[in-house]
């Protein structure tokens, strides 16, 4: 296909043998859903690919590293989406059926476990949440690899998108609070250990990029930033 049409051949194509086009809302959601599908509560975003951010020194963490740095930036991004969807003039937006299913699966995982935010999340509950998020992403990915996008669209209320942003931000903020060190700094990278029925978390030493990321996340108040 690349030989026939050039660089467009590397894009996703639809059943009509044309480049599959989506709107900006769908592109913005796809970005954050790919991150949240690898979210480990109170730990960060699981670095389970072979491209763990810009810092080559963290290549050794692939597979069992968890990035709070990525979660800090995800918070900033999700807050932007919340503000954006709260200000748009439309009430509905059409999104690919496959992505809506992923969105609903991730959102229901957060909603069903919202009560856990009242305290520290146990290793068992952490594993249950990660497994549900991971299965949602696996189903989405397997469907695309096998069949591609079917071409169907679902109208999603902007109020649903706002609610999703709010709920996910609650989980993100809970994790940020859990990663505040006793000296007032914030953890940058953690390690996860998968046991038979849970996910255990251990902390690495402090790193500069963790402080830069949390300062830009929008989580801290001006007073906390100066402290």
Annotated model-derived regions:
Residues 1-227:
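Acidic, mature catalytic/reactive cores of soluble proteins
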């Amino acid at each position: 296909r690349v030989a026939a049409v050039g660089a467009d051949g590397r894009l996703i194509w639809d059943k009509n043998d044309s480049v599959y086009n989506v709107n900006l809302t769908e592109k913005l959601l796809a970005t954050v859903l790919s991150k949240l599908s690898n979210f480990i509560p109170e730990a960060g975003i699981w670095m389970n690919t072979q491209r763990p951010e810009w810092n080559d020194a963290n290549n050794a963490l692939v597979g069992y590293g968890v990035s709070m740095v990525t979660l800090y930036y995800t918070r900033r991004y999700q807050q932007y989406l919340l503000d954006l969807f709260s200000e748009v003039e439309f009430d509905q937006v059409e999104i690919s059926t496959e992505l809506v299913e992923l969105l609903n699966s991730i959102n229901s995982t957060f909603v069903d476990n919202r009560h856990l935010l009242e305290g520290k999340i146990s290793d068992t509950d952490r594993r249950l949440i990660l497994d549900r998020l991971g299965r949602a992403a696996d189903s989405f990915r397997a469907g695309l690899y096998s069949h591609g996008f079917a071409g169907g669209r679902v109208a999603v209320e902007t109020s649903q998108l706002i609610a999703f942003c709010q709920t996910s931000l609650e989980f993100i903020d809970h994790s940020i609070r859990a990663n505040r060190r006793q000296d007032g700094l914030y953890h940058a990278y953690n390690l996860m250990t998968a046991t038979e029925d849970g996910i255990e978390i251990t902390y690495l030493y402090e790193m500069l990029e963790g402080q830069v990321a949390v300062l830009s996340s929008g989580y801290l108040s001006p007073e906390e930033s100066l402290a």
